[in-house]
Regions:
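Amphipathic, well-ordered alpha-helical segments in soluble domains
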Residues: 66-73, 101-108, 130-137, 158-161, ...
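Hydrophobic alpha-helical connector segments
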Residues: 65, 79-111, 118-119, 129
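Amphipathic alpha-helical packing segments from all-alpha helical-bundle domains
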Residues: 121-144, 152-163, 182
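Amphipathic alpha-helical interaction segments
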Residues: 40, 93, 111, 153-164, ...
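C-terminal peripheral helix-coil segments that are non-catalytic and often amphipathic
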Residues: 2-7, 140, 171-207
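Helix-turn-helix
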Residues: 19, 27-65
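Alpha-helical DNA-contacting segments of helix-turn-helix folds
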Residues: 28, 60-70, 74-75, 112, ...
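Basic, helix-initiating cap at the start of DNA-binding domains
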Residues: 1-31, 39-40
Length: 207
């Protein structure tokens, strides 16, 4: 059953940009992302193509907007993360929150990721930037102090963990995403052993 906050979100009037993003995601769930044009998205959204291009000059700009929407939802749901938990458990919860948000459009996300991996350097660079922003957000939500070279290393480690969990999640057919959770827990446990040797390790919080 939908909770009160979900009901509130569903009653809010969508903006034209949200309509464009959702139209793109619907198409991506049905066909390869690299085969979709802005004209296709405009037709799906039932808006003039010129109006869509005014908001999104390129498909990449549309994906950036979608990425920001995901970040906003993760930020809102991340308030449920308890600072009483150790850092490893906080990171586990934060990553699962992000995957849960992406789960609203899993088929579309899979299509976009496949196209990104086969895309041009500009698309790949944008994907790397989005990953870094997402991992930075996760560390912030979990109360990890910002700044320092050590944090840069932590971001790289967490990025690899997240990408591996994402790979499993895209193919996870268990009702409770059990395979994904097991993969993520195992990776975070291994990272815990590695990063405990570093000062202010993100996985070395209160026990």
């Amino acid at each position: 059953m939908a909770n009160a906050s979900t009901k509130k979100r569903s009653k809010r009037k969508k903006t034209p940009s949200q309509d464009g993003v959702e139209a793109a995601l619907r198409l991506a769930a049905r066909m390869p992302w690299d085969g979709i044009s802005l004209a296709d998205i405009a037709a799906e959204a039932r808006v003039p193509e010129d109006d869509l291009r005014a908001m999104f000059p390129t498909k990449l700009s549309l994906l950036k907007t979608y990425g920001r929407q995901v970040d906003e939802q993760v930020e809102a749901r991340g308030t449920s993360i308890s600072m009483d938990e150790n850092m490893k458990d906080r990171l586990f919860e934060a990553m699962m929150i992000r995957l849960d948000v992406l789960g609203d459009h899993r088929d579309a996300v899979a299509s976009i990721i496949r196209a990104t991996l086969q895309g041009n350097p500009k698309t790949i660079t944008a994907g790397a930037s989005a990953l870094r922003r997402a991992m930075t957000q996760l560390l912030d939500l979990c109360g990890e102090p910002s700044g320092g070279l050590c944090r840069q290393f932590k971001l790289r480690v967490l990025g690899l963990i997240y990408l591996n969990a994402l790979r499993v999640w895209l193919k996870d057919d268990t009702p409770d995403t059990g395979k994904t959770m097991a993969t993520l827990d195992k990776a975070l446990t291994r990272a815990d052993a590695l990063l405990k040797s570093l000062p202010t390790s993100p996985l070395h919080g209160a026990r």
